[in-house]
Amino acid sequence: MLICNDKSNPKTLLEEIMALRPWRKGPFEISQIKIDSEWDSSIKWDLVKNATPLKDKVVADVGCNNGYYLFKMLEHGPKSLVGFDPGVLVKKQFEFLAPFFDKEKKIIYESLGVEDLHEKYPNAFDVIFCLGVLYHRKSPLEALKALYHALKMSGELVLDTLIIDSPLDIALCPKKTYAKMKNVYFIPSVSALKGWCERVGFENFEILSVLKTTPKEQRKTDFILGQSLEDFLDKTDPSKTLEGYDAPLRGYFKMLKPSKL
């Protein structure tokens, strides 16, 4: 949890926080008010925080949401930090949080998507984190290509995506929805993902972790509006989504843009 002991008026603060719902990423605590977000993002952060050193590096978080991971990255002493997310509400959440957790204003927040990266930030970053974005892209290869071109030579990508448990070079393409999400297009096997990354040009593909999503990590709270993980799974068989697909399984990976093309 990110904690800030500020002297703000708790009543006013809570009103501001609730007006910015739904809070997907967190949790945060400000003036003893806990923002109990849908996701306990500390679980994912613990899996990737030591993937590569960030000290004195130029770092990006693509799909940064409200900035939770950016604020955590500040603790590792990067040279600079840029977050990318086109969402309007999550930027408002970031603007609310930044005075508490980025008092030196080190973070740049760009309202851009992954497709904008290589044109506006070519060869710019030592490290890019892209967490929970790839399966939302209609063209995952184009997204990987954009990430590749935004990295400097010898730059590293830390990637998190939904995966399927299969030894084959295949991907699940949900017919209409996956776990009630309309914007999920391709969920690859690890082998298929490795092939995609290598076709784009990445090397040294490494599996950091594979983890099932559980209600400990994602659940309904008073700080979101609507449903969460348990509403998306088959109540008679929680190993399946409502659509009959395997329940969410996430893979965490690291890869390298080579020093020479």
From Swiss-Prot:
A GO biological process held by the record: tRNA wobble uridine modification
InterPro entries xref list: CmoB, Mo5U34_MeTrfas-like, SAM-dependent_MTases_sf
GO molecular function: transferase activity, transferring alkyl or aryl (other than methyl) groups
Binding site for carboxy-S-adenosyl-L-methionine: K25, W39, K44, G63, V114, E115, Y135, R250
EC number(s) given by UniProt: 2.5.1.-
Reaction(s) catalysed (UniProt annotation): carboxy-S-adenosyl-L-methionine + 5-hydroxyuridine(34) in tRNA = 5-carboxymethoxyuridine(34) in tRNA + S-adenosyl-L-homocysteine + H(+)
Pfam families noted in UniProt: Methyltransf_9 (PF08003)
Enzyme class (EC, first level): transferase
Keywords of the record: Transferase, tRNA processing
Keyword Transferase among record annotations: yes
Record bears the keyword tRNA processing: yes
Annotated HAMAP family: tRNA_carboxymethyltr_CmoB (MF_01590)
Job of this protein: Catalyzes carboxymethyl transfer from carboxy-S-adenosyl-L-methionine (Cx-SAM) to 5-hydroxyuridine (ho5U) to form 5-carboxymethoxyuridine (cmo5U) at position 34 in tRNAs.
Family: Belongs to the class I-like SAM-binding methyltransferase superfamily. CmoB family.
Subunit record text: Homotetramer.
Name of the protein this chain belongs to: tRNA U34 carboxymethyltransferase
